[in-house]
UniProtKB/Swiss-Prot annotation:
Keywords per UniProt: Hydrolase, Magnesium, Metal-binding, Nucleotide metabolism, Nucleotide-binding
SUPFAM superfamilies for this protein: ITPase-like
Enzyme Commission code(s) on record: 3.6.1.66
Positions with a binding annotation for substrate: 8-13, 70, 154-157, 177, 182-183
GO MF term (any one): dITP diphosphatase activity
Subunit note: Homodimer.
Cofactor remark from the record: Binds 1 Mg(2+) ion per subunit.
Domain of life: Bacteria
Positions of Mg(2+) binding: 69
PANTHER family: INOSINE TRIPHOSPHATE PYROPHOSPHATASE (PTHR11067:SF9), INOSINE TRIPHOSPHATE PYROPHOSPHATASE/HAM1 PROTEIN (PTHR11067)
Family note: Belongs to the HAM1 NTPase family.
Function: Pyrophosphatase that catalyzes the hydrolysis of nucleoside triphosphates to their monophosphate derivatives, with a high preference for the non-canonical purine nucleotides XTP (xanthosine triphosphate), dITP (deoxyinosine triphosphate) and ITP. Seems to function as a house-cleaning enzyme that removes non-canonical purine nucleotides from the nucleotide pool, thus preventing their incorporation into DNA/RNA and avoiding chromosomal lesions.
Protein name (record): dITP/XTP pyrophosphatase
């Protein structure tokens, strides 16, 4: 079984990725298990940040690395929090504070004008200088509710509502979320290529 490093120490992401890639012959380990710290996200796009993280993980561990950069894009806020989703309320990152700030920013925005989407880019590098990274992206359309609802998931899940399913991401079971999320959609693009890419 091939080793693949997740360029993140986020336990929620690691669990999601392991569940979504079940059946693929990969041992997925968080970079934190190798003592690798997060690298500053200095890119100006989701793709740049994912590449920065994947290269850093490859360089520090010597293994192929998978990195994602994702965020919540809210139309009424001109795309914010976007690239700064994890640090929207400042650092250190705090999901509850991020959610509270976002809800405050949308306080006067009525139903019907609270459209949003989760967007994810996933990058897979065989080595730090891989000239041909595998890149996929995924989008999950929804809207922002007026108050948090549900206890599952992480990040903005309690305030991101999927009208098709009539619930927030935090109210969904992991099985459903792992089929329809932005990250799941990006990983679905990668799944078929993983066997060849890792050979």
């Amino acid at each position: 079984m091939k080793q693949l490093v997740l360029a993140s120490g986020n336990a929620g992401k690691l669990g999601e990725l392991r569940a979504m890639l079940a059946g693929v012959a990969l041992q997925i380990t968080a970079q934190s298990e190798f003592g690798v710290q997060d690298v500053p996200e200095t890119g100006l796009t989701f793709i740049e940040n994912a590449l920065i993280k994947a290269r850093h993980a490859c360089l520090m561990t010597g293994f192929p690395a998978l990195a994602d950069d994702s965020g919540l894009i809210v139309d009424a806020l001109g795309g914010a929090p976007g690239l700064y989703s994890a640090r929207y309320a400042g650092t250190p990152t705090d999901a509850a504070a991020n959610n509270a700030k976002l809800l405050e920013m949308l306080r006067d925005v009525p139903v019907g004008r609270r459209s949003a989407r989760f967007y994810a880019v996933i990058v897979l590098l065989r080595h730090a200088e891989d000239p041909q990274p595998l890149i996929a992206d995924g989008c999950w359309e929804g809207e922002i509710v007026f108050e948090p609802c549900g206890s599952g998931g992480f990040g903005y899940n309690p305030i991101f509502f999927d009208p098709l399913y009539g619930m927030t991401a935090a109210q969904m079971g992991a099985e459903l979320k792992n089929k329809i999320s932005h990250r799941a959609r990006a990983l679905e693009q990668l799944r078929d290529c993983l066997h060849t890419f890792m050979a």
